[in-house]
């Protein structure tokens, strides 16, 4: 009888990526298969997020539900990972005795050893250290699960914004070697991946080592990835404005594989609040980045993050945020009411904005951005859009679903053979959360590169150095 693993994931795309690697790791080394039902599992893993309010309480509520399963099956192993695990450490075990393993985002690669320790009778295994690049060195071979894939290129953040727990839960910025990233993406392309999303807490701060002792910048990495045959779209998240340098903007000018959509968090439009947040830039500097981006890529659309009701935020500060939203014409946002994160500098500030006022401001902001998004969608009516077909439509499995370059879901009537490939559709209707398309042409009528073997990719761009080591040169 096969051993079963159940993983519950909360939080960001990096957590989703980490959870997929946990599943691959335990499948490869210990033969576990995933199950959607916690009741069927031999191991339960909770991958946590500490961004939202009451994150810790949410964890303990879930552990309380899992405790009933362990009461029935004492051999059940329960593990807690992610940012709350990194933040709380042993305190989780002190409060929830049912937990066997506590691991941080940088130690998930040690899970097989931790499980073995528990099987040998150890009461609790806790490892929330920050061993830097070791995690990436010990991850299993990449495995595609569709035409899109997330690839982690760096972890952590060294910006220490006053409201943010990331530097304390994931550590400071650590970049993967560029050759490792390129090889992983080439392997994914061989498996049919057409779009990659490069992940990092501060992805544009990437500075990865090269095999010859040099440093690969984020702009250079984007061009290397764009040169991999079969990869026709590149996205990345999340970025920081102070690292959004001109060389990255230049890539938008000459690299069509990089999509015309950017998520660039600003958090506030008030210079006073930005200073209190320790963001390291002013609103005018953010607008300067957007202005230069739109010069390089006129059709680019921008989304952002906003924190509403940060300590000391006045009506004037909020008005500055709304002015920025109007000036930039954001297409989408992730916006949240401020809640203090324990251990951050902002947690010591008086939370002096009334909750009803916060809710009202949030509603105003979200309504404005929804209006702007609908305006963009209506402008797409009658246009032909190239979409990557991801699978059946969520609401109607007899139809197909794809995503435009500017990150809009399009549902259309089409043949299953198009799943995993690009098609052109005419936009014929607009809804709040999706578009309606009419099939125009398939990929066989497009001029796209489809050389799927990494060996072919390397051979096409091969260049040996003095030691005979093959370098990848786009």
Swiss-Prot record:
PANTHER family: CDK5 REGULATORY SUBUNIT-ASSOCIATED PROTEIN 1, MITOCHONDRIAL TRNA METHYLTHIOTRANSFERASE CDK5RAP1
Pfam entry (one): TRAM
GO cellular component, one term: cytosol
Alphabetized GO MF terms: 4 iron, 4 sulfur cluster binding; metal ion binding; N6-isopentenyladenosine methylthiotransferase activity
Entries under SUPFAM superfamilies matching the protein: Radical SAM enzymes
Residues covered by the TRAM domain: 378-441
Residues reported to bind [4Fe-4S] cluster 1: 12, 49, 83
Oligomer status and interactors: Monomer.
Protein name from the UniProt record: tRNA-2-methylthio-N(6)-dimethylallyladenosine synthase
SMART domains registered for this protein in UniProt: Elp3
Cofactor field: [4Fe-4S] cluster
């Amino acid at each position: 009888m096969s051993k079963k693993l159940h993983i519950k994931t909360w939080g960001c795309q990096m957590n989703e990526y980490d959870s997929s690697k946990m599943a691959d790791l335990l499948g490869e080394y210990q033969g576990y298969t995933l199950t959607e039902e916690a009741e069927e599992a031999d191991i339960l893993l909770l991958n946590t997020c500490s961004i939202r309010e009451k994150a810790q309480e949410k964890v303990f509520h879930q552990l309380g539900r899992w405790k009933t399963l362990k009461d029935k099956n004492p051999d059940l192993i329960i593990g807690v990972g992610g940012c709350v695990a990194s933040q709380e450490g042993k305190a989780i075990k002190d409060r929830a005795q049912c937990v066997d393993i506590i691991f941080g985002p940088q130690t998930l690669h040690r899970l097989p050893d931790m499980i073995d320790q528990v099987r040998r009778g150890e009461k609790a295994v806790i490892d929330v250290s920050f061993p830097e690049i070791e995690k990436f060195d010990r991850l299993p071979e990449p495995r595609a699960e569709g035409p899109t894939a997330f690839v982690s290129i760096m972890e952590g953040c060294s910006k220490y914004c006053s409201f943010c727990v990331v530097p304390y839960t994931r550590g400071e910025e650590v970049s993967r070697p560029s050759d490792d990233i390129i090889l992983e993406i080439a392997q994914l392309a061989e498996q049919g991946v057409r779009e990659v999303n490069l992940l990092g807490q501060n992805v544009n701060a990437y500075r990865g080592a090269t095999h010859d002792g040099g440093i690969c910048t984020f702009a250079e990495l984007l061009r290397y990835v764009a040169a991999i045959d079969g990869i026709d779209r590149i996205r990345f998240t999340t970025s920081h404005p102070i690292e959004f340098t001109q060389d990255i903007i230049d890539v938008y000018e000459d690299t069509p594989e990089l999509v015309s959509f950017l998520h660039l968090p600003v958090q506030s439009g008030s210079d006073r609040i930005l200073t209190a947040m320790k963001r390291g830039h002013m609103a005018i500097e953010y607008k300067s980045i957007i202005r230069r981006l739109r010069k390089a890529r006129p059709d680019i659309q921008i989304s952002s993050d906003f924190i509403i009701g940060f300590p000391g935020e006045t009506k004037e500060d909020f008005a500055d945020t709304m002015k920025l939203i109007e000036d930039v014409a954001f297409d989408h946002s992730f916006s949240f009411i401020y809640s203090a994160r324990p251990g951050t500098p902002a947690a010591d500030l008086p939370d002096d904005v009334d909750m009803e006022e916060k809710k009202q401001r949030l509603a105003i902001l979200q309504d404005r951005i929804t209006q702007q998004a609908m305006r963009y969608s209506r402008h797409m009516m009658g246009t032909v859009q190239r979409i990557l077909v991801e699978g059946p439509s969520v609401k109607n499995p007899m139809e197909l679903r794809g995503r435009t370059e500017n990150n809009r879901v399009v549902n259309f009537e089409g043949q299953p053979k198009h799943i995993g490939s690009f098609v052109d559709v005419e936009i014929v209707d607009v809804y709040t959360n999706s578009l309606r398309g009419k099939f125009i042409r398939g990929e066989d009528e497009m001029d796209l590169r489809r050389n799927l073997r990494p060996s072919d990719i390397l051979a096409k761009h091969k260049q040996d150095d003095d030691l005979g080591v093959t370098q990848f040169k786009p």
